[in-house]
Regions:
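N-terminal flexible segment immediately upstream of the FAD-binding catalytic core
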Residues: 1-58, 68-100, 129, 152, ...
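C-terminal substrate-binding/cap subdomain adjacent to the FAD-binding core in PCMH-type
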Residues: 31, 139-141, 145, 149-375, ...
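Long hydrophobic segments that form regular secondary structure
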Residues: 214, 222-242, 260, 266-283, ...
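Iron-sulfur-cluster electron-transfer modules
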Residues: 387-390, 604-727
Length: 727
């Protein structure tokens, strides 16, 4: 590993991280898995990427392309050299307003792209719930969808072309238009189109007919029925296993600024599922589910409580959020009226007299719509805010079926959960038959890992019975690739392997995903692996609301599910240090991961009190932004106190901390000797000389000491009325 780092340092300009702490921060994504990478490179250019690929081939190591690290299926963890595109490789290369298209680097965040497009009246509409931190490269690799796919389609429908490196180091343009193809690319294209023609009948028979299908490779893009065949669509959804993206051309859409929302209330979950197939006939741009568990949990989160109280009437078991957006805003009232009439026709009324209880809350205020959208986009994280060791686990969460089968499918899956002694939490995309459901399990327990396996087997059998997709949005990764034979058949698995072999014969790119996958329940790959435990540690604060060692300190740390909400770059206050550095070390998620690895002994002895841990916490300004905005309630400012207390107990209090902490004690003396105290700011070189001793940076002046204390009668304001403060 050290040898790999030494070689890379001579050949790349980007940042390299090979220490244990940094590698640990990239060992997890938002899935249940953990795999320690060999090292991390944040490339600054295509030259850096080309050099990294060359070195990887020479040294026999794998490459993992990573964006926001928000994968829920383990796509972005591997024992590989990780290339983090999000820090530097993230710009807009071209913007063609006339033809409504743009070309971007893979590391650009969706929200950042849409902020740049908004002044031009355009946007990229694959509006995933993680838009504040999801990168376009990651979305393309996953074939992401978003809540408005009913109108705008998926990533595959909105990616026009991709520039990418192949495993041999050659770079090519995948798309219908562009420079004349090289002979190597033409041969590859011809091979793939022959393959598509050969397997067209099998593909038609085996691929689910539902809109939401992201499992396996998009080899249906190669069949004669898909002409013109765009090989970029084969790369979309390939999870970084076929090529390394360097530029992605996107289709843009006009912004429909006016929209309205109808919040449909149902007394039972089954009623909502049955109604979805009828509501979509009104042509909304989205129908999203919120179940009673999510409503209850959201009420306990300060930032969502008022929204719930304003929107929810009575005690519904489920809500369907039906959104309309029209170029002609005068049609909105017509749409809402039609929605109310349909709910009545389906047999619902607010009174419940002679009909089932239910109705529509109309939301026309854009600010309230925005708050509801924030609540819905935080659905996963709200579900994860349970404080016990049992958490909603992602492994069958986005299966998709046809809308007429949705009610029966959800009822069947609920029976499976009950059979295994657990329950599911439901939310997301009712309009396309793709609901997110996570059974509550404790994956620290072997019995619950076995339960997870059994639920997965039975769930995918149920999906196959309804001819649905076992992966409707979140991809394959480590959690679902194993089941491709069950869902697609042995011949299709062989086809996927053939494509992988043609593009990447030596397995350079992200091995173990889509093809040649390990067992999904191999605990050696889990975040909570065999022997995972935290020894008892002394803590100074009350952590009794959580479980685990340190009086619950462990459980509070483990509340971080790696969703990455702290990586947002605009809006709110979380996380200020990350917004400046854009480094994983300086974001709440990175700090929480470091703490978890430290207290469980995965970073070596005394990791909690080490200098590397102090550096991890150094730029946390204790602003409590995470406490107020993290949907799972991670309070890094409070955790930092424990780290500082443990470090002080072991190493004593530093001079820097003493100078800050004891300021009130020595301030009167410094004031009297202000001419000496202020020398540090005025004498050339003195600030630099004292920097290492005091810990105060030489690049900034310290506050100037006054020889006249402000409480002195000479400087105090006179003749002011007395004030009484009631505290």
């Amino acid at each position: 590993m050290t040898h790999l780092a030494e070689i890379l340092r001579t050949r790349v300009q980007g940042d390299l991280l090979f220490d244990r702490f940094s590698r640990g921060r990239y060992a997890t994504d938002a899935s249940l898995y953990q795999m320690m990478p060999l090292g991390i490179l944040s490339p600054k250019s295509e030259d850096d990427i080309a050099a990294a690929l060359d070195v990887a081939r020479e040294q026999g190591v794998s490459i993992l392309s990573r964006g926001g690290g928000t994968s829920q299926c383990g796509q972005t963890v591997n024992e590989a050299l990780v290339l983090d595109n999000s820090q530097y490789f993230n710009g807009i290369l071209q913007l063609d307003l006339e033809n409504m298209r743009c070309v971007v680097r893979p590391g650009i965040v969706l929200d950042e792209l849409n902020r740049a497009l908004k002044p031009h009246g355009l946007w990229f509409p694959v509006d995933v719930s993680t838009a504040s931190r999801a990168t376009i490269g990651g979305m393309a690799g996953n074939n992401s969808c978003g809540g408005k796919s009913l109108r705008y389609g998926m990533m595959r429908d909105n990616v026009l072309s991709i520039d990418a490196f192949l495993a041999d180091g050659s770079k090519h343009h995948f798309g219908l238009n562009g420079p004349a193809p090289s002979p190597e690319y033409q041969t590859l294209s011809d091979d793939m189109l022959r393959f598509g023609a050969r397997e067209a009948q099998e593909i038609d028979a085996r691929f689910p007919k539902v809109m939401r299908r992201v499992g396996g490779y998009n080899i249906d893009a190669l069949t004669p029925g898909q002409t013109p065949n765009n090989l970029a669509h084969l790369l979309v959804g390939s999870e970084g296993t076929l090529a390394y993206y360097t530029a992605i051309e996107l289709k843009l859409w006009p912004i429909l600024s006016q929209k309205v929302l109808g919040v449909c209330h149902f007394a039972t979950f089954h009623q909502a599922m049955d109604a979805a197939q009828h509501l979509v006939t009104l042509h909304p741009q989205g129908v999203e589910l919120v179940d009673s568990t999510m409503i209850s949990l959201a009420r306990d989160i300060p930032m969502f409580r008022a929204t719930i109280e304003e929107v929810v009437t009575g005690k519904p078991e489920a809500l369907l959020l039906v959104e309309f957006a029209e170029e002609d805003a005068t049609l909105h009232s017509t749409r809402l009226k039609a929605l109310e009439e349909m709910m009545g026709d389906l047999g619902y009324s607010w009174s419940g007299i002679g009909k089932a209880w239910g109705g529509v809350t109309k939301v026309t205020d854009s600010a309230l719509q925005g708050r509801i959208a924030d609540l819905r986009s935080s659905g996963l994280n709200i579900m994860m805010s349970m404080k016990d060791d049992g958490k909603p686990v992602s492994f069958v969460e986005d299966c998709a079926v046809e809308l007429p089968d949705l009610a029966a499918y959800t009822a069947g899956l609920t029976e499976i959960f009950e059979k295994h002694g657990t329950r599911g939490t439901w939310y997301a995309h009712a309009s396309v038959g793709c609901l997110h459901v996570r059974p509550v399990l404790n994956l620290k327990l072997d019995k619950d890992v076995k339960t997870m396996r059994a639920i997965a087997e039975e769930c995918f059998d149920l999906v196959a019975r309804y001819k649905g997709s076992h992966s409707g949005e979140h991809g394959d990764g480590l959690v679902r690739s194993e089941f491709h034979e069950k869902m697609f058949g042995a011949r299709m698995v062989s086809n996927f392997a053939e494509v992988k072999k043609r593009f990447d014969p030596n397995g350079l790119f992200n091995p173990g995903k889509i093809v040649d996958a390990p067992k999904m329940d191999d605990r050696r790959l889990f975040r909570y692996g065999p022997g995972y435990a935290a020894p008892e540690i002394r803590t100074e604060l009350d952590w009794s609301a959580w479980t685990g060692s340190g009086g619950g300190f462990q459980g509070a740390i483990e509340m971080c599910n790696n969703n990455g909400a702290c990586r947002k770059l605009k809006g709110g206050v979380m996380c200020p240090s990350y917004r400046v550095t854009r480094k994983e070390q300086d974001v709440t998620r990175g700090r929480a991961n470091t703490l978890r690895l430290a207290i469980t002994g995965q970073l070596g002895p005394d990791a909690l009190t080490s200098e590397a841990m102090a550096e991890t916490m150094k730029l946390c300004v204790s602003c409590k932004g995470c406490k107020s905005e993290c949907p799972t309630g991670v309070d890094m400012a409070r955790m930092k106190i424990e780290v500082q207390a443990a470090r002080a107990q072991k190493h004593g209090i530093s001079l820097h901390d003493r100078l800050v902490g004891y300021l009130p004690r020595y301030a009167p003396w410094a004031s009297r000797l202000s001419f000496l105290a202020n020398l540090r700011n005025s004498v050339p070189g003195l600030a630099r000389l004292t920097e290492s001793l005091t810990g105060f940076t030489a690049t900034r002046n310290l506050p100037v000491w006054s020889a006249h204390p402000f409480r002195n009668d000479e400087v105090a304001q006179q003749d002011q009325p007395k004030a009484v403060i009631f505290a």
